[in-house]
């Protein structure tokens, strides 16, 4: 965990980074997400203060279902949100079919790094006692912090990319290149 703590310290992050785990089965040490999240990327911010897992049915954005490995582009093409976004020209079905995708998983967990450190004082949820298999780390940065991340990646020879919409694709792209992807947002 020292590496994640060091990243947060050096960047002077306002919020804890969030560990993202791709799992085949539900963890007994984490609670299932309860509530409504409009899009898959919403879980990243919710994970700042908590530890929980999500299933396919918790992800309410069809494009997020594709990038998070729950559905194929063909499976979501008739969904209302996809039809709306393609009809206004925000994205095409061809673009959706070419988006990076996380490996197919049954469960995606989001865990505040503070919970992994055993700090449990922020937000709700239990402190995570066992170390999960972390696939990705996400954190929210301002422009100065992004500059430091890019500089560090360049100096270390780590591939990095910048992506606009859809932001949910940054996880799959980072996983694929085993590097850093900076998301600029969807709108």
Protein language model regions, located:
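Acidic, serine/proline-rich low-complexity intrinsically disordered regions
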Residues: 2-187
